[in-house]
Amino acid sequence: MEADKIEVGQTYTCESPLLKKSFKGTVEKIYDLSVLVDVHEFEDTDAKKVDDLNGRLVVPFYSVNPS
């Protein structure tokens, strides 16, 4: 997704190599090439990893999709 279309406080579907499945999260902060996402909807198989990461991930713009 293009950076100018991503908004803080909005929920998006994202992907990360750290998790096995895609997840939904709310953008907390926008960086130069990525965003900080608060993860709130994820698969049970990723629950431990999300907990280890304190429910937050930095993902690149190209891994963010509209929900």
Each language-model region and where it sits:
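Short, electropositive, low-hydrophobicity segments enriched in small/polar residues
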Residues: T13, K29, V59
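Short beta-strand-centered aromatic/proline hotspots
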Residues: K21-K29
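Short, acidic/hydrophobic/Gly-rich beta-strand patch recurrent on exposed beta strands
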Residues: L36-H40
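Intrinsically disordered, low-complexity, charged/polar segments
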Residues: E43-S67
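A generic structural micro-feature
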Residues: I6, P17, K29, D51-L53
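Short, conserved beta-turn/loop elements at beta-strand boundaries and strand-helix junctions
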Residues: I30-V35
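Short coil-to-beta transition motif at edge beta-strands of beta-rich domains
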Residues: E2-L18
